[in-house]
């Protein structure tokens, strides 16, 4: 998924506020499901974040175009671990440039029952979709 950096994404120094990288990653994950005409939840359960490891490399800034890349690191019965990277692929000036990594994260999600929040098996449909990433 690609997105552009807007004023609302930046801090007083004009660079992307650190928490927004996690928002970009979440949007990419959600967009993946939406493109399949599926919500990332069902009547029984929902994905919840268990843990996040984040690395910040070079700050992105206003007007740049970012590309969020997602890979499956591990898929088990009740959890999935995704590796997501964000690259700057275009500057605001639109001049050609070599892409560079700005952020990387490893995020572990559990699938839990909506009422009890206890772990339950990831539904077959979601596993099939995740394996297609």
Swiss-Prot record:
One Pfam family hit: 4HBT
InterPro entries per the UniProt record, alphabetical: 4-hydroxybenzoyl-CoA_TE, HB-CoA_thioesterase_AS, HotDog_dom_sf, Thioestr_dom, YbgC/YbaW
Enzyme Commission code: 3.1.2.-
One function term, GO molecular function aspect: fatty acyl-CoA hydrolase activity
Superkingdom per UniProt: Bacteria
Keyword Ion transport: no
Active site residues according to the UniProt entry: 11
PROSITE patterns attached to this UniProt entry: 4HBCOA_THIOESTERASE (PS01328)
Keywords: Hydrolase, Lipid metabolism
Single GO biological process annotation from the record: lipid metabolic process
Keyword Ribosomal protein: no
Entry-linked NCBIfam families: YbgC/FadM family acyl-CoA thioesterase
Biological role: Thioesterase that may be involved in phospholipid metabolism. Displays acyl-CoA thioesterase activity with lauroyl-CoA (C12:0), myristoyl-CoA (C14:0), palmitoyl-CoA (C16:0), stearoyl-CoA (C18:0) and benzoyl-CoA, catalyzing the hydrolysis of the thioester bond. Has low activity with butyryl-CoA and octanoyl-CoA.
Assembly behavior: Homotetramer. May interact with CagA.
Similarity comment: Belongs to the 4-hydroxybenzoyl-CoA thioesterase family.
Protein's name in the database: Acyl-CoA thioesterase YbgC
Organism: Helicobacter pylori (strain ATCC 700392 / 26695) (Campylobacter pylori)
